[in-house]
Each structure stands twice: as C-alpha cells, then as structure tokens.
C-alpha cells in the first residue's frame, strides 16, 4: 500500500520510538516569538543548558508590537516580553528579527518569505497557527511553552503520530471568492472538531490553481478545525516561490529532487476523506464566536439550535434570520498571519482604489512584515489605502488579538481577515466577523457586508 504525504514527512524525522508508541521527532526549524518563549529560556538557565541548534532557530517580535508607533511601547508586560526576548536571543545566540530590522514581521509571514520554510521540514513554534507553513509540504504545528523548552534544549519532540485526512478541492472559484472562503465553508459544514487527531492534507485541481499565499491561508486555519496541522504537497509553484530566497538551500537542485518525492501515492488511503466542489462557493461571513459559526453572504443567519448558539447571538448582538447585509461594521482589519501578505493587500487595494471608507468606519491595513510593507509601498498600495481613508500601519499581529494597542471597542463589530472570532479576541466585548481581504475592504466602503461576487469595484453593487 502506498504512503500518504504525512507518512513520508513523519518517517523521515523519527529518531526513535518508546514503549508507549510515542515517536521522538527531529525538528528542522524552530520559530520563536516574545509571548511563549520567556519561561522556556528561563528553564534553560535554571538547568544550565544551551540552545542545541541556534542555527535551526529563528526569533521575531510580532504579538506585542504597536503598529502605529513601534517604539512607543506603553504596556509594561508587553515591553518586558519584548526586552526579555531580545536579551534571551543575545545570551543564547539565537538569530532575532528585532523591531526595526528588515526581516521583522509576523512569524508565519517571515518564515516563508525568508526561505526558512521549505518542503520536507518539520517546523514548530509556540503559536497555534504554525500550520501555515504546511502549504510548502512541511509538517508544521504549534507547541506549548514546555515543548518550546524541550526543542530549544534537544532539537527534538516526543509526539504521537496523527491520522491523515484528505480534503479534495474540485472546481474553479468564482471571482470574488477566495481561499479564506473555502476554509470558512469547511468549518461551517464540518465544525471545529472535524480534524481532531488528524493532519489535514489539501489537494485537487483547486489547489493546483492556487498561488502559494492562498495555500498558506488554507493551512493557517486547519487548526480551527481541530487539526494537528494542514499540509499541501509541494509542486512547481512551491519550488519557484522558495528558490532564491535568503535562507533557501544553496545547492537548490539537490533539495528540489528530494522535494519532488513529497506527495501522497496514488494507492494510499486516507483515514478520513472529504471532497468539496468550490464552483458555486460564495463569500463567507462568520456571525458567531467560533470560526464554524459562518454563513454564505447570500444566506440569512441560522436559527438557534443550542445554548452555544444562544450565547453567540447574545454576545454578537445579532438575531436569527437576520440578513448578513444588515450586520453593521464599525471597524475593518486587514492583516494577521492569515491574510497580510502582498497578494492579500493587492486584492484589498483593487476593491478600494478611487473610493472612500464609509464615514464612521475605522479601517486598518497592517502588512505582515517589513518586506511585505516595502513591496506594497513600491507598488503604491499605501497611497491607494490612505487616499481611501484607511490607516496604513507598521508590521505586527495588530488587531488579530487584544495584546497590543490595536483593539476593537466593546460592543462594536469588526470585519477582520484574521483567524479567530472568540469572545474578547480583539478586545473586551469586541464582535469579530472573519472574512476575506476583499470582503473586509468592501465592508469598509459600505459600513456593512456586501457580496464581492457582485461588487464591480467601480461603486456599483447589487444586493439581490
């Protein structure tokens, strides 16, 4: 019987197996940020250990950074975490993309753009959305702080092998529909626990047509379906993306030959299989307090089915049967490790070019990294956004989570390109609606959600 992509990635990294069936995996890349690393480094100090492979470790600052004035850090805890990471990286000789450095940015944005992320690697980070890197055919997953310490000290991690889920995507997306809508559709149909105990492998003609940055969006949110990771077999688009980047292999051709072996064999069998035809897929909007609580833009909000729905409707200030077009939007956030790359900003800019943000709407664009910001500026995207009435910010996690000054006031609604809409995620009492960059940009213009399939980008729109 053939092997799945998961099998090939896993078997290449098993050092040994213990009596309980746990495998000791070798870790090829350890990404670090300021929030989940302080206790791990302190653990090394207390046991007089060193970082085993600083050359396979890379740190950045992202969660706590103010995006309006990056040097004006007024929160005491945020400043302490940033200062601590800086000191730890210096002591343990770990490479750091510090505030102001050209390589700084959100950890799951800079990994791929610097060429640190490569097919066939095992990649971990003390962050839920490490699955992003799986878009390159890497086995990438989030870990806890105690595991961060274990990897720093040993460059290995004890893990139980997950099962493999195959998700086949068929058909061609309509204009105005994106990878973000695919993953929100998947979650709304199958729930936030469908992937528990699995690694999701996305494949099919739809994947083949996607560029790398859309594939990253898909894998980024695999964790929202409960999956250990999300992976996509590398192809020519993957190889072209990686080649020539700063940390890409120097003997590239040798690595590329090995990467071509990373695919699921034709006679391999998944433990669970799902097939989705995206041809008639519509833009999605989440209405509730987890990513599975979403509907098509042309659907009404659902009826209440249980106490969770009851609580979600109450928290969000919405009612069953309400039209998605009638949901008010006071804030728009285009950013996060899900949708802050150059192609995301280009899509949003194409929506708002020559138009104005609705009066009363606060709209932010936060590039995912310094390199994304610089590339966007070279293309003049910052002018398009600023002329439309958006705030153009510096790179960071920003409004994705309430750990920095970028927050949504209590009781107000935000159209967000991020990945989580939990209660209080964007600030106390904040009401988050997850959407694609195009949907978020259009909501900024109208002060409510509209159908980006019908949005002509010249001011005309149809709601029917």
Curated annotation (Swiss-Prot):
4Fe-4S recorded as keyword: yes
Database matches in NCBIfam families: leuC (TIGR00170), PRK05478.1 (NF004016), PRK12466.1 (NF009116)
E.C. number: 4.2.1.33
Enzyme class label: lyase
Keywords for this protein: 4Fe-4S, Amino-acid biosynthesis, Branched-chain amino acid biosynthesis, Iron, Iron-sulfur, Leucine biosynthesis, Lyase, Metal-binding
Cofactor note: Binds 1 [4Fe-4S] cluster per subunit.
Function of the molecule: Catalyzes the isomerization between 2-isopropylmalate and 3-isopropylmalate, via the formation of 2-isopropylmaleate.
One GO biological process term: L-leucine biosynthetic process
The keyword Metal-binding is assigned to this record: yes
Pathway where this protein functions: Amino-acid biosynthesis; L-leucine biosynthesis; L-leucine from 3-methyl-2-oxobutanoate: step 2/4
GO molecular function: 3-isopropylmalate dehydratase activity; 4 iron, 4 sulfur cluster binding; metal ion binding
Binding site for [4Fe-4S] cluster: 337, 397, 400
Entry protein name: 3-isopropylmalate dehydratase large subunit
Quaternary assembly: Heterodimer of LeuC and LeuD.
Catalytic activity line of the entry: (2R,3S)-3-isopropylmalate = (2S)-2-isopropylmalate
Cofactor names: [4Fe-4S] cluster
Entries under SUPFAM superfamilies matching the protein: Aconitase iron-sulfur domain (SSF53732)
Protein family according to the UniProt entry: Belongs to the aconitase/IPM isomerase family. LeuC type 1 subfamily.
Organism: Bacillus thuringiensis subsp. konkukian (strain 97-27)
